[in-house]
Amino acid sequence: MSVRYAEDRYPGGDESAGIASLHAFSFGGFYDPGNLRFGALLACNEEHLAPGAGFDEHRHSHTEIVTWVVTGELTHRDSAARTTVVRPGDLQRLRSAAGVRHSERNEGTEPLVFVQMWLAPREPGGDPAYDIVRGIADSTPYAVPEAGAMLHVRRLAPGERSAVPDGAYLYAHVVRGSVLLDGEELRPGDSARITDARGLELTGHGAHDDDRAEVLVWEMAQPG
């Protein structure tokens, strides 16, 4: 198991425009040839947008983009004339396929924090697609079959345990709270990368009963 701590992430964004970013993988102007991807996962970015800030319309292709809002509200607009407001607990997926344009902005009055994860599809091309799941439950994994991946959301009270799925590649990102994974304490922004995961368990590790942890766990097959 390889643990990457929150402070190890690459900073990015444009603070003068109200945007602060933290990148777990090489991204934009930050290039590390030893940290390009893990399994199908190409990016895990934590984005902080001040009220009124955002990413203007831009193009994506051949990428599966999954977004998880931590606090605030994210307004998504795309080239299919779709406008969606994504809130905490919602999961948004954009399949960019052969090409799609979209914008992401904080049109609310409170700061916005979201985690956005990019995955490589097994086959390029195809038609763009969009999906949103409102208030996804812990027991409902979300499949991204085009990337051979499954996302599991785990919310744990202190002392509560949950099995981690077995998989060729497993990536865990702590959104909030504290957990133990294979005896290693992980805090917000920390992540773990595990190959050939078998029989692992997450345990909530908060100091108080209301210190619930939230973890995003990607279960990924061997790249196709």
Protein language model annotation of sequence segments:
Residues 1-224:
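Jelly-roll (double-stranded beta-helix
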